[in-house]
Amino acid sequence: MKPLNVIFAGTPDFAARHLQALIDSEHNVIAVYTQPDRPAGRGKKLQASPVKALALENGIAVFQPKSLRDEDAQAELTALNADIMVVVAYGLILPKVVLDTPRLGCINVHGSILPRWRGAAPIQRALWAGDSETGVTIMQMDIGLDTGDMLLKTQLKIEDSDTSATLYEKLAEQGPSALIEALAGIAQDSLPAEKQDESLANYAEKLSKEEARLDWSKSATALWREIRAFNPWPVSHYEHEGNTIKVWQSHVSDETSSKLPGTILSADKNGISIATGEGVLIITQMQLPGKKPLSVADILNSRADWFTPGTVLTSTDNQEA
């Protein structure tokens, strides 16, 4: 197999792990594209992306255009004369002229089994929907949003204990090896492309903080899925006397209740049991304002008065039943 001359485009840690796999492979990473440095931390100093930092460590040329619609940026990319461009969580739109520039086009590593979840938040939406599996898709990019032909797919069972954080880690481990396998197939022209079935497609839009507000009229199962999907961001929450209480971990109880949704049924070291629209949810890890996430057992040692059985939680504040 003849090694490919690769341009890599990506920004966060998830992307950097794929870049590392490329650096370790027989292919040649001739340039890296990443988003411009952003202010970060308390001092708001400009900070390089994980992808840029890794590229510089390995002596790879870095390009940081604000847009790839710019003709000068496009001319720079063309001059690199790449065989292929690998795109992983880059964050910039690639116009058609860019997609067509590398000899073999552009491929993308997408964190779901397409076409089930297209868009920005496939990991979170898969959890929220109660999917039993997810995976990674290596896709030939076209001008649509995650609509290109599929080149390779992996599968990963979603466990009951999984959150967006744990799935992110698992897919960050699966993705790099899938990418290298796909590149081998592309280099040998032995990887058949599969069209996406449009009837199976859903759009995984970016999460919002508003969506993370817990609605106790939903079923315990739905709330449990939401809490897992919103961990680690933006974190499911409810209000108590004007304070935002974040919920990090929970599970569905075998109990049933005829109490009003949002009613605290019990509170002890094993968790806080809350009646929902259907079933009972047990919260086991929470975060009080200005504090770090703690087990319910630890929180009850200091704030048991906030979790008195009989209290009814609403989507805006608490009321005594």
Curated annotation (Swiss-Prot):
MF-aspect GO terms: methionyl-tRNA formyltransferase activity
Metal-binding in keyword set: no
EC numbers, comma separated: 2.1.2.9
Reactions performed catalytically: L-methionyl-tRNA(fMet) + (6R)-10-formyltetrahydrofolate = N-formyl-L-methionyl-tRNA(fMet) + (6S)-5,6,7,8-tetrahydrofolate + H(+)
Record carries keyword Translocase: no
Broad enzyme group: transferase
Gene Ontology cellular component list: cytosol
Keywords linked to the UniProt accession: Protein biosynthesis, Transferase
Amino acids binding (6S)-5,6,7,8-tetrahydrofolate: 112-115
Function: Attaches a formyl group to the free amino group of methionyl-tRNA(fMet). The formyl group appears to play a dual role in the initiator identity of N-formylmethionyl-tRNA by promoting its recognition by IF2 and preventing the misappropriation of this tRNA by the elongation apparatus.
Family of this protein: Belongs to the Fmt family.
NCBIfam families per record: fmt
PANTHER family: METHIONYL-TRNA FORMYLTRANSFERASE (PTHR11138), METHIONYL-TRNA FORMYLTRANSFERASE, MITOCHONDRIAL (PTHR11138:SF5)
The protein's name in its UniProt record: Methionyl-tRNA formyltransferase
Annotated organism of origin: Shewanella halifaxensis (strain HAW-EB4)
